[in-house]
Amino acid sequence: MSHRFSVLPQYLLPKQALTAFAGFVASRERGWITTEIIRRFVAKYQVNMEEAARSDIASYLTFNDFFTRALKPGVRPLADADLISPVDGAISQFGRIEHDQIFQAKGHHYSTTALVGGDAALAAQFQNGSFATLYLSPKDYHRIHMPCDGRLARMVHVPGELFSVNPVTARGVPGLFARNERVVCVFDSPRGPFVLILVGATIVGSMATVWHGVVNPPRGKQVRAWDYDPNAEAAVVLRRGEEMGRFLLGSTVVMLFPAGPLHFNPDWAPGRLIRLGEAMANYA
């Protein structure tokens, strides 16, 4: 009950308006003001700028430019594993999908069908499969990479709420990740289909993919979908470790994998910090 009480103010906040305003401000070029905002952000969240391809704070013209900064080559080596972590962040939850339900936090599950935008046929492909939910904090690197090789088959933008997605909110808001705005990316891989979902949150100005660019805004009320032929000559093909998208202000990634002999890294546990490229899982 205490967790639900702690998130009560989020139900009352004008989250859409706050997010639109934050996105507007973060995209403006304000010279020394922008530099000072970035400097304070780096100090508050202890961002490691030595890993950034551009370590000079003054080189970033906008806050979004800084927030989606690239890393230096080689600072995130790829592990020898079938699936690697697609982000820097922290493990929220991971495990099996049972009876169309995904574990969110103690006392909370949510529907796989709802998560993917109501597509029951798509959700059925992951019955008895596996999921992993990874949280990106403000200090983290905010580009998302591929956990394995994949060919894009479909992308869906699902409008929704914009609750915060931090651990406290995950424990206090039922069905959080299936309620928030999200971009659902469906890929074909040598091991079958998998889904990588970018979940929006309060202050997340937008989400973008490398093949489409900015997906949102616009923020309408209808689900939007784009189909891609994974076998076409011009198919979108991304290799393990390649960038697939980014958050313009942070959030959460949820991945779905079909039933099979998938074994997660034995070192993984909820709350553990992770880095892009580390071993996530292997097939037996």
Swiss-Prot record:
UniProt record, GO biological process: phosphatidylethanolamine biosynthetic process
| Requisite cofactors | pyruvate
Q: Which reaction equation describes what this protein catalyses?
A: a 1,2-diacyl-sn-glycero-3-phospho-L-serine + H(+) = a 1,2-diacyl-sn-glycero-3-phosphoethanolamine + CO2
Q: Report the GO molecular function annotations.
A: phosphatidylserine decarboxylase activity
* The protein's annotated pathway: Phospholipid metabolism; phosphatidylethanolamine biosynthesis; phosphatidylethanolamine from CDP-diacylglycerol: step 2/2
Query: So where's the catalytic machinery, residue-wise?
Result: 88 (charge relay system), 145 (charge relay system), 251 (charge relay system), 251 (schiff-base intermediate with substrate)
List keywords of the entry alphabetically.
Cell membrane, Decarboxylase, Lipid biosynthesis, Lipid metabolism, Lyase, Membrane, Phospholipid biosynthesis, Phospholipid metabolism, Pyruvate, Zymogen
Gene Ontology CC terms: plasma membrane
Q: How does it sit in the membrane?
A: Peripheral membrane protein
Q: Where in the cell is it found?
A: Cell membrane
EC category: lyase
Asked if Transmembrane is a keyword of the record, the answer is: no
At what residues does the UniProt record annotate the site feature described as Cleavage (non-hydrolytic)? Answer: 250-251
Q: How is it modified after translation?
A: Is synthesized initially as an inactive proenzyme. Formation of the active enzyme involves a self-maturation process in which the active site pyruvoyl group is generated from an internal serine residue via an autocatalytic post-translational modification. Two non-identical subunits are generated from the proenzyme in this reaction, and the pyruvate is formed at the N-terminus of the alpha chain, which is derived from the carboxyl end of the proenzyme.
- What does the record give as EC number? 4.1.1.65
Does the keyword field hold Hydrolase? no
> Positions modified as Pyruvic acid (Ser)?
251
Cofactor-binding details, from the entry? Binds 1 pyruvoyl group covalently per subunit.
Q: Which Pfam families match?
A: PS_Dcarbxylase
| PANTHER family attached to this UniProt entry | PHOSPHATIDYLSERINE DECARBOXYLASE, PHOSPHATIDYLSERINE DECARBOXYLASE PROENZYME, MITOCHONDRIAL
Family, according to the entry, reads as follows: Belongs to the phosphatidylserine decarboxylase family. PSD-B subfamily. Prokaryotic type I sub-subfamily.
Reported function: Catalyzes the formation of phosphatidylethanolamine (PtdEtn) from phosphatidylserine (PtdSer).
How would you summarize the oligomeric state and partners of this protein? Heterodimer of a large membrane-associated beta subunit and a small pyruvoyl-containing alpha subunit.
Q: Which HAMAP family match?
A: PS_decarb_PSD_B_type1
Per its record, how is this protein called by name? Phosphatidylserine decarboxylase proenzyme
Organism from which the protein derives: Polaromonas sp. (strain JS666 / ATCC BAA-500)
